[in-house]
């Protein structure tokens, strides 16, 4: 969300502050950008080896599974699981299902952060000459329809998915360029289907103790 609304895809680090932000996310984006710039200023002024990274959409264990306020993956897991146990024949999903998104499992996020912190700081500086942060993601995109179908496979739900095209899709495509991170020697390890399976298993084992705020 820190990148301009109309920035080219995939989103390169260099696109930061090159255009107007998405209005609905602007305060959130400005807060993140301020954090990146503050770390950069401390690094310049005081010589602190601060590192800034910008992740793509994260998911995994300990996520927020609130039925109204959660992000797309926990929301779909909760909704499709509920449909399965209540024997609902259909699940409605907002939008056409054709919007494309990128998702990173939380353990891969932690792995990437550790990798970047352990890399020689001179390498990080070489990668961040034009902008003081690195993107973290998979570089792989999936449509919301494909995501929902994967979750149905993991949950073993055999009903029908109904896409309500009267509801908004949001940004048609959102994927990060992670070529700099790859040049630094890091690759994600957890496939989307494996990550979804681990997340659903955790969800099942923590009924009654889920974060729902």
Segments (PLM) and residue ranges:
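C-terminal substrate-binding subdomain of Rossmann-fold SDR/epimerase-dehydratase oxidoreductases
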Residues: 82-213
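Proline-centered helix-kink/hinge sites
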Residues: 24-27, 55, 74, 168, ...
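Glycine-rich, phosphate-binding/catalytic loops in enzymes
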Residues: 10-14, 69-71, 110, 152-154
